[in-house]
């Protein structure tokens, strides 16, 4: 049986930590930020951990090696 390939869309969007948590970048920073406060924009920086239920789905369906 051939190796399982990771879905390339998931590869670009998610990262799995050493402890098995799934990290993702928060949405809402592409355009229209003139309406947001500086604090809101600052809080969207960096990465966030995905909730456990969603993380399980991501690992199961999109990242076969994760």
UniProtKB/Swiss-Prot annotation:
One of its GO terms (molecular function) is structural constituent of ribosome. Keywords: Ribonucleoprotein, Ribosomal protein. InterPro entries: Ribosomal_bL35 (IPR001706), Ribosomal_bL35-like (IPR021137), Ribosomal_bL35_CS (IPR018265), Ribosomal_bL35_sf (IPR037229). It holds the Pfam family Ribosomal_L35p. PROSITE patterns: RIBOSOMAL_L35. GO terms for cellular component: cytosolic large ribosomal subunit. GO terms for biological process: translation. It comes from the Bacteria. HAMAP family: Ribosomal_bL35 (MF_00514). Belongs to the bacterial ribosomal protein bL35 family. NCBIfam families: rpmI_bact. This is Large ribosomal subunit protein bL35. It comes from Methylobacterium nodulans (strain LMG 21967 / CNCM I-2342 / ORS 2060). The gene is rpmI.
């Amino acid at each position: 049986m051939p190796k399982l390939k990771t879905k390339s869309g998931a590869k670009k969007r998610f990262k799995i930590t050493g402890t098995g948590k799934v990290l993702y970048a928060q949405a809402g920073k592409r355009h229209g930020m003139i309406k947001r406060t500086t604090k809101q924009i600052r809080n969207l920086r960096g990465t966030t951990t995905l909730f456990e239920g969603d993380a399980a789905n991501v690992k199961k369906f999109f990242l076969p090696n994760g």
